[in-house]
From Swiss-Prot:
PROSITE patterns, A to Z: RGS (PS50132)
Record's protein name: Regulator of G-protein signaling 13
Role, per record: Inhibits signal transduction by increasing the GTPase activity of G protein alpha subunits thereby driving them into their inactive GDP-bound form. Binds to both G(i)-alpha and G(q)-alpha.
UniProt keyword annotations, A-Z: Signal transduction inhibitor
One GO CC annotation: cytosol
The encoding gene: Rgs13
Species in which this protein is naturally found: Mus musculus (Mouse)
GO terms for biological process, alphabetical: G protein-coupled receptor signaling pathway; negative regulation of G protein-coupled receptor signaling pathway
One Pfam assignment: RGS
RGS domain ranges (all copies): 34-150
InterPro entries: RGS (IPR016137), RGS_sf (IPR036305), RGS_subdom1/3 (IPR024066), RGS_subdomain_2 (IPR044926)
Source superkingdom: Eukaryota
Ribonucleoprotein is among the record's keywords: no
Length: 158
Protein backbone atom coordinates (compact mmCIF):
# COMPACT_ATOMS: atom_id res chain seq x y z
CA UNK A 1 0.00 0.00 0.00
CA UNK A 2 2.89 2.40 0.60
CA UNK A 3 3.49 2.63 -3.14
CA UNK A 4 -0.08 3.88 -3.59
CA UNK A 5 0.15 6.33 -0.71
CA UNK A 6 3.28 7.75 -2.31
CA UNK A 7 1.44 9.01 -5.39
CA UNK A 8 -1.40 10.26 -3.20
CA UNK A 9 0.96 12.27 -0.99
CA UNK A 10 2.83 13.70 -3.96
CA UNK A 11 -0.45 14.72 -5.54
CA UNK A 12 -1.65 16.39 -2.35
CA UNK A 13 1.60 18.29 -2.00
CA UNK A 14 1.17 19.36 -5.63
CA UNK A 15 4.49 17.71 -6.53
CA UNK A 16 3.02 15.36 -9.09
CA UNK A 17 0.23 15.34 -11.59
CA UNK A 18 0.79 11.66 -12.42
CA UNK A 19 -1.92 9.29 -11.36
CA UNK A 20 -2.28 5.56 -11.88
CA UNK A 21 -3.28 5.21 -15.51
CA UNK A 22 -6.38 3.21 -14.65
CA UNK A 23 -7.76 5.70 -12.09
CA UNK A 24 -10.75 7.18 -13.86
CA UNK A 25 -12.93 10.20 -13.29
CA UNK A 26 -15.88 7.82 -13.02
CA UNK A 27 -14.24 6.02 -10.09
CA UNK A 28 -13.32 9.23 -8.26
CA UNK A 29 -16.87 10.56 -8.70
CA UNK A 30 -18.29 7.27 -7.34
CA UNK A 31 -16.45 7.92 -4.10
CA UNK A 32 -18.75 10.88 -3.46
CA UNK A 33 -21.93 8.78 -3.85
CA UNK A 34 -21.54 6.86 -0.59
CA UNK A 35 -18.96 5.24 1.63
CA UNK A 36 -20.18 1.90 0.32
CA UNK A 37 -19.48 3.02 -3.27
CA UNK A 38 -16.02 4.27 -2.27
CA UNK A 39 -15.18 0.97 -0.58
CA UNK A 40 -16.29 -1.02 -3.64
CA UNK A 41 -13.78 0.64 -5.99
CA UNK A 42 -10.15 -0.25 -6.63
CA UNK A 43 -8.47 2.93 -5.37
CA UNK A 44 -11.17 4.32 -3.04
CA UNK A 45 -10.14 2.32 0.05
CA UNK A 46 -6.47 3.16 -0.57
CA UNK A 47 -7.08 6.90 -0.84
CA UNK A 48 -9.55 6.95 2.06
CA UNK A 49 -7.08 5.06 4.27
CA UNK A 50 -4.32 7.51 3.32
CA UNK A 51 -6.61 10.40 4.28
CA UNK A 52 -7.46 8.81 7.63
CA UNK A 53 -3.78 8.13 8.26
CA UNK A 54 -3.02 11.83 7.71
CA UNK A 55 -5.76 12.61 10.24
CA UNK A 56 -4.30 10.06 12.68
CA UNK A 57 -7.62 8.20 12.71
CA UNK A 58 -7.09 5.15 10.53
CA UNK A 59 -7.96 2.60 13.22
CA UNK A 60 -11.60 2.41 12.08
CA UNK A 61 -10.85 1.58 8.44
CA UNK A 62 -8.10 -0.84 9.44
CA UNK A 63 -10.44 -2.61 11.87
CA UNK A 64 -13.22 -2.72 9.26
CA UNK A 65 -10.88 -4.20 6.64
CA UNK A 66 -9.44 -6.68 9.16
CA UNK A 67 -13.00 -7.83 9.94
CA UNK A 68 -13.68 -8.37 6.24
CA UNK A 69 -10.60 -10.62 6.11
CA UNK A 70 -11.51 -12.31 9.40
CA UNK A 71 -14.98 -13.32 8.12
CA UNK A 72 -13.32 -15.35 5.36
CA UNK A 73 -11.23 -17.49 7.73
CA UNK A 74 -12.63 -21.01 7.59
CA UNK A 75 -10.44 -22.85 10.09
CA UNK A 76 -11.23 -22.76 13.78
CA UNK A 77 -7.55 -22.43 14.71
CA UNK A 78 -7.05 -19.54 12.28
CA UNK A 79 -10.16 -17.79 13.56
CA UNK A 80 -9.07 -18.09 17.20
CA UNK A 81 -5.62 -16.71 16.41
CA UNK A 82 -6.94 -13.80 14.34
CA UNK A 83 -9.73 -13.00 16.83
CA UNK A 84 -7.18 -12.65 19.62
CA UNK A 85 -5.08 -10.32 17.46
CA UNK A 86 -8.11 -8.20 16.59
CA UNK A 87 -9.05 -8.05 20.26
CA UNK A 88 -5.54 -7.04 21.37
CA UNK A 89 -5.18 -4.36 18.71
CA UNK A 90 -8.67 -2.83 18.48
CA UNK A 91 -11.02 -3.98 21.25
CA UNK A 92 -9.00 -4.23 24.47
CA UNK A 93 -9.36 -1.06 26.55
CA UNK A 94 -6.29 1.18 26.25
CA UNK A 95 -4.97 -0.77 23.27
CA UNK A 96 -2.88 1.24 20.79
CA UNK A 97 -5.65 1.35 18.15
CA UNK A 98 -8.70 1.02 20.36
CA UNK A 99 -11.91 1.64 18.43
CA UNK A 100 -14.88 3.54 19.82
CA UNK A 101 -17.60 0.98 20.60
CA UNK A 102 -20.13 0.70 23.41
CA UNK A 103 -19.49 -1.47 26.46
CA UNK A 104 -22.23 -3.97 25.55
CA UNK A 105 -20.59 -4.71 22.20
CA UNK A 106 -17.15 -4.90 23.81
CA UNK A 107 -18.43 -7.33 26.47
CA UNK A 108 -20.07 -9.56 23.84
CA UNK A 109 -16.74 -9.81 22.01
CA UNK A 110 -14.87 -10.57 25.23
CA UNK A 111 -17.33 -13.40 26.00
CA UNK A 112 -16.95 -14.93 22.55
CA UNK A 113 -13.18 -14.58 22.16
CA UNK A 114 -12.36 -18.13 23.35
CA UNK A 115 -14.60 -19.73 20.73
CA UNK A 116 -15.00 -16.95 18.18
CA UNK A 117 -17.54 -17.26 15.40
CA UNK A 118 -17.17 -15.71 11.97
CA UNK A 119 -19.65 -13.03 13.07
CA UNK A 120 -18.34 -12.20 16.55
CA UNK A 121 -16.99 -8.81 15.41
CA UNK A 122 -19.99 -7.99 13.22
CA UNK A 123 -21.69 -5.54 15.61
CA UNK A 124 -18.42 -3.70 16.28
CA UNK A 125 -17.80 -3.57 12.54
CA UNK A 126 -21.25 -2.03 11.97
CA UNK A 127 -20.61 0.58 14.66
CA UNK A 128 -17.22 1.49 13.20
CA UNK A 129 -18.71 1.72 9.70
CA UNK A 130 -21.42 4.06 11.01
CA UNK A 131 -18.75 6.25 12.66
CA UNK A 132 -16.88 6.47 9.36
CA UNK A 133 -20.04 7.12 7.36
CA UNK A 134 -21.24 9.91 9.64
CA UNK A 135 -17.93 11.50 10.59
CA UNK A 136 -14.73 10.90 8.64
CA UNK A 137 -16.27 10.14 5.22
CA UNK A 138 -18.02 13.56 4.92
CA UNK A 139 -14.76 15.23 6.02
CA UNK A 140 -12.87 13.22 3.41
CA UNK A 141 -15.15 14.50 0.63
CA UNK A 142 -14.48 18.09 1.72
CA UNK A 143 -10.77 17.50 2.21
CA UNK A 144 -8.03 19.07 0.16
CA UNK A 145 -6.84 15.55 -0.67
CA UNK A 146 -10.08 14.51 -2.35
CA UNK A 147 -10.69 17.89 -3.99
CA UNK A 148 -7.15 17.98 -5.42
CA UNK A 149 -7.42 14.42 -6.69
CA UNK A 150 -10.79 15.14 -8.30
CA UNK A 151 -9.45 18.29 -9.94
CA UNK A 152 -6.42 16.47 -11.31
CA UNK A 153 -8.45 13.57 -12.68
CA UNK A 154 -10.94 15.98 -14.25
CA UNK A 155 -8.16 17.92 -15.96
CA UNK A 156 -6.58 14.72 -17.29
CA UNK A 157 -9.85 13.41 -18.68
CA UNK A 158 -10.74 16.55 -20.63
Amino acid sequence: MSRHICWICKLCRDESKRLPSNLTLDEVLKWAQSLESLMATKYGPIVYTAYLKLEHSDENIKFWMACETYKKIASRRGRISRAKKLYNIYIQPQSPREINIDSTTREAIIKSIREPTQTCFEEAQKIVYMHMEMDSYPRFLKSEMYQQLLKTVQSQSS
